[in-house]
UniProtKB/Swiss-Prot annotation:
Disruption phenotype: Significantly reduces vegetative growth and conidiation, but no difference in germination and appressorium formation compared to wild-type. Significantly reduces virulence.
Catalyzed reactions per annotation: Hydrolysis of terminal non-reducing alpha-L-arabinofuranoside residues in alpha-L-arabinosides
Subcellular location: Secreted
Gene field: abfB
E.C. numbers: 3.2.1.55
Pathway annotation from the record: Glycan metabolism; L-arabinan degradation
Region span, ABD: 359-467
Descriptive protein name: Alpha-L-arabinofuranosidase B
Biological role stated in the UniProt entry: Secreted arabinofuranosidase that causes degradation of rice cell wall components during infection. Required for virulence.
The species this protein was found in: Pyricularia oryzae (strain 70-15 / ATCC MYA-4617 / FGSC 8958)
Signal peptide coordinates: 1-25
Active-site residues annotated for this sequence: D51, E229
GO cellular component terms listed in the entry, alphabetical order: extracellular region
Site label Important for catalytic activity, responsible for pKa modulation of the active site Glu and correct orientation of both the proton donor and substrate, positions: D166
Amino acid sequence: MLSLKAVLRFASVAVAVVLPTLAQAQAPEPSLSVRSPPVSYNNTLVKQRADPQILKHTNGRYYFIATVPEYDRVVMRQADSIQGLSTAEERLIWARSQSKAGVGYVWAPELHKIGDKWYIYFALGRTAPFDVRPFVLEGTGSDDPMAASWAEKGFITTDFDTFSLDATTFEVNGVRYLSWAQADPRFDNGGGTSLFLARMTNPWTIQRPSIVISRPDQPWERIGHNVNEGSWGMVRNGKVFVTYSAAATDANYCMGLLTADQNADLMNPASWSKSKDPVFVSNTATSQFGPGHSAFTVSDDNQSDVLVYHARQYKDIRGEPLDNPDRMTRVQKLYWRSDGTPDFGIPIPDGPHPVRLRSSADQTLYVGIANNAVQSVKDAPVQNTQFKIVEPGLGGSGTISFESTAQPGKYLSAANGSVSLATLSNTSDAGARSSASFRRVAGLSDATGVSFESAAQAGSYLVSGGNGAAVSVAPSTGAEATFYLE
């Protein structure tokens, strides 16, 4: 039987077209492929680190920066892999106690390489905890930001001297922009925060006036607090996508999405459209609450885009959410729909990252859940096509089981030639556990793929059908019994 490591290796080989990474996204008109190999991360990645960012440097190393619960310093860690950041040593980059720049909160640091220098943007309280404004550090003297010499460039001056935070920078068609959240005296009597955008004249100065690209004007953005914050810009498939977070920093915290054409005038507010509904929200089934303040990076093999965000593992918080330290850094693969738009899915459960099973017979189809039935599906919500590979499986050594991501505790189960989704986590019935188990072998029609023999029905394999057709187990040896993992 093939090991999980071998299956992931085969899956990587089977990808015919490499997905252009976010790091490559500045190239004009990137091509689109919705296919990319699976990733093998384990959540939670870093405990008690909020507002996370992971940057993959050109040397292949990953750098991690985030808000610490004490809100008093900027720390950084590095590793050769995303998973390696989980246990990497942290290094102090800047401490409020060693500076005269401010006395208040230190929030949401971000690391960026601009030219041959490093920059860290974060919110710093000037004269009081909540008197926050965007602040900039410049790192020089080393291609490694952990070894750079850091100097304070100061606060960024915006159009209004009001509460402002979460500065981020991105480049589109050779023009560098800054986006940030700020209380706008022209909206909600100066309450809440809107998202602003401006061109930059240098890494610590914007060209004024700025524009507003989003206000908290939807009901889901106004729960607890009227908030748009934590933006992140990326260019893909001829579009500029800006993710952001909304509402109070409890279980109501969620993510929205702004979109503009890459060649549009980004300084024209009319160029931007907003998602009607949030694109990433709390999920009780997976026990992840308040997901948000996202950033994006690329996988270790450079073939998948990776969503970086924070969430809590419980819903109810005692006291002020800001005083709660349990926002955890998490990572998961970002998928792309055939129309070129991102599908964020749901916050996946703790533990190993799930996979998708793409049919070798029709590579637009996936094993998925539709109307509580296991079917071959096309363009389904990504969470309905994700399964965690449990190894050893419920049937014991030498087997694996497929646990639904959207419905944890439910597994693919084969009986009498059909496949269903069954609740089996706590069952001691050996027959039921065997029915929910498979043996993994090299792809029957393509050795770079993988096939799954039923542990309960020897010689019968998991088989895909046409779009909307039931997934079954049968003694097939063709492409319909071979899958590629994503």
